[in-house]
Amino acid sequence: MSRRRRGQAIHGWLAIDKPVGITSTDVVNRLRRTMDAAKVGHGGTLDPLASGVLPIAFGEATKTVSYVMDGTKVYHMVVGWGEARDTDDREGKVIDTSDVRPDAQAITAMLARFTGEIEQVPPIYSAVKVEGRRSYDLARADQAVELKSRKILIKDLTLLETSTPDFGHFRIVSGKGAYMRSLARDLALALGTVGHVVALRRLACGPFTAETAISLDMVDALGHDAPHSESLLPIEAALADIPAVPLTEAEARRLSQGQPVSLLHLASRTPLNGLAQGETVQALLNGKLVALAKIVEGEIRPLRVVNL
């Protein structure tokens, strides 16, 4: 009996503009079918309530997903004041109310407290694991959930407008692991009220931005031709913030075989200014990624080899 075909070997990234109402996994599964792709993953979960940039990795690009997930995110968030929800967004049940509506002056004065490195407790309806089980599974089973706080980084938090007393619009620039639902909840409490996320849109995720993201309908229209579209970005697109080191064919072959390359050989033909011990680099041959590597004791040692 013949083996079932597993799909095309597609390698690269698509920046998808995820619509409201579907999960990140829904997007992955839809693209796998539409593009007949053998291997697909995403670079940072967006809740069903949220829209915006969802980076999708194909094939060998999945080896670079962690670098996108560790990257900076930019959001536009609308907070509704006066109602706390069990999910910390508009899809949950109302669990508390308040008549307090903070004004722009009070909100602006509070923002510094939530900027920089802060402690944050994830929402109980989240994928955080508690003794091997997802927190949202425990919450849905009406089991008590107590999550530990964690350090997260809010690089910038700006009040854009207060269109009505019931809503505040914010622009947030965050590091990895920050929950916007928790930020809305905690900001409201600090302002003497309660609140939840009414709308959330991700404007950027690592190097991928809303300006270059494409819709699922556009991918559907391309179908199996999507891998040949200019929208499919190279694997290196996810690594814009990582220094690049050019290799010769012989050096590329060594790294591909799991062997280190001497920095002295590289330095003899190309400047390596600014590279530090322990730093991660992208090793390139003719502009194409060969491996992600680390500088250790005068050598470039492969971390993740790309097989194209």
Swiss-Prot record:
Its EC number is 5.4.99.25. InterPro entries: PsdUridine_synth_cat_dom_sf, PsdUridine_synth_N, tRNA_psdUridine_synth_TruB, TruB_C. The keyword Chloroplast does not apply. Coiled coil: none annotated. GO terms for molecular function: RNA binding; tRNA pseudouridine(55) synthase activity. Responsible for synthesis of pseudouridine from uracil-55 in the psi GC loop of transfer RNAs. Belongs to the pseudouridine synthase TruB family. Type 1 subfamily. This is tRNA pseudouridine synthase B.
